Structures are given as C-alpha cells and as structure tokens.
C-alpha cells in the first residue's frame, strides 16, 4: 500500500474540492492519503510519502506563494525525493487563465528533485484543471488522477 500527500492551497475552496476528489480516487486505489492545507505540510514530512501531489490556484500564471515557499524550502531535501511519484493540479477563474503554467511550475520543482511525474493520455494532460468551482468533468478527472498516482506509487514501492 502506498502513502500519498495531497497538499493544497485554497482561498475560495475550489482547489480544496479538487484535492478531496483526488484523495477519493487515490483511496479507491488503496492508498493511505494525507490531505493537508499547504500551510500544514512540513519539508521533513515529504520524505515519508511514496507520492506527493500539490495543488494551487492560478495567481498571475503561477502557483500561490505558500506552494512556491514549500518548494523553495524543500531544497534541503535535494536528491532525497528522487524516485517518488509527483503530480500537480490547479484551479483558475478563467479559461486560458494560467492553469497549465501553474501546473508546469509545480512540476518543474518536482522534476528538479528527481521525482517521477506521469502525464495523462486522455483528459487533462499535465494534471487536473478547473475553471471556478469543480464540475462533474473536473471531479472525474481528479478521481482518475488520484487513481493514477496511487497506482504508480504502489507499483514502484512494490518493486523497490
């Protein structure tokens, strides 16, 4: 059984709702999930997870400051997160408002750590996105993403 962290920053509740859907999908796959506001995530705790998924609203085409701060502070663990599975998700107010650039910014930080970040062949390719409050499509994408990350984390753990 794999253990996942889903850390998120949410001002309006939209990103939190996405995180909850992702957690539901991961739990369906049998993962132990810690669902935490980003302010409650500590850098040392990142070592205890097989997979780390971070979510942020889009702020001017990038991630919220608390998410960026966690990634910046995680430099203390450089190299120690290599081989873990990572992922990202985002919400925004507008279509074309910066969801993908926000997700890619988070993914860049995960890749620098040597984490494995899978793409999604059908749907939201870089990770789930929502425009305003998550609708049924977003709920499906989030649950599917949680299943995907949990399954990969479990397989890697079983092989390791």
Task: Identify the function of each model-found stretch.
Residues 10:
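Extracytoplasmic "Venus flytrap"
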Residues 2-5, 14-160:
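FMN-binding flavodoxin-like domain, especially the glycine-rich phosphate-binding loop
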């Amino acid at each position: 059984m794999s253990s996942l962290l889903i850390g998120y920053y949410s001002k309006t509740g939209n990103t939190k709702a996405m995180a909850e859907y992702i957690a539901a999908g991961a739990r369906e796959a049998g993962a132990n999930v810690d669902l935490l506001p980003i302010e409650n995530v500590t850098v040392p705790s990142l070592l205890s997870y097989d997979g780390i998924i971070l979510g942020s609203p889009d702020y001017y085409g990038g991630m919220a400051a608390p998410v960026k701060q966690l990634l910046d502070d995680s430099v203390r663990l450089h190299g120690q997160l290599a081989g873990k599975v990572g992922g990202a998700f985002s919400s925004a107010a507008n279509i074309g408002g910066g969801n993908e650039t926000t997700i890619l910014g988070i993914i860049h930080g995960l890749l620098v750590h040597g984490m494995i970040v899978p793409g999604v062949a059908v749907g939201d390719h870089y990770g789930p996105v929502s425009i305003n409050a998550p609708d049924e499509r977003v709920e499906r994408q989030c649950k599917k993403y949680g299943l995907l990350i949990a399954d990969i984390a479990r397989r890697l753990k079983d092989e390791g």
